[in-house]
């Protein structure tokens, strides 16, 4: 099989891609909590894509830090020129993304998983995501993780996300008594709880170590 050529799943490769879940999540959220038509919500994104938005300092820093991975992608032209990110306050437009949102507005959110968009997604990863992979995808409601931290309620998403790292690290702060130990404790607490990430959360549903 394809994976036999690799000791680990390559990071920037179609083998590392899973079915995009955001659109299915929008549908669930809209159906359960929404009182604004999804078409009106999509209009906001469509207008932003075509009218443009300015690059903030935070976005610029992120684009700069990840330019090696992002600048060569097909959508990278919106944010990069000659492999360098556009400067802060540059007006950016995303016409291709706007067109995608327009198709979802016209055909419904399910078009993302069953229509031409699904075919393009499959083709972009050399068929490693199949038609059935996409059409059968469903967003799942899960109980959030909860932890009391300094008397406050902390909530985050459960595995297979890495939200547990945030709660576990913050909980570790409660044992800090010496300000000089703050940074060391911050680093070590994160390292400890991150150590199980690749062994457990990568396939949480199929892993018994929960």
What are these regions (language model features)?
Residues 25, 100, 168, 172, ...:
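Generic recognition of well-ordered alpha-helical segments
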Residues 31-36, 106-109, 173-179, 198-201:
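Short helix-capping/linker segments at secondary-structure and domain boundaries
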Residues 1-161:
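Noncatalytic scaffold domains of N-terminal-nucleophile
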Residues 163-177:
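M16/insulysin-pitrilysin zinc metalloprotease superfamily fold
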Residues 21-24, 164, 184, 188:
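Generic recognition of short, well-ordered alpha-helical interface segments
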Residues 177-210:
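Internal maturation/activation junctions in enzymes
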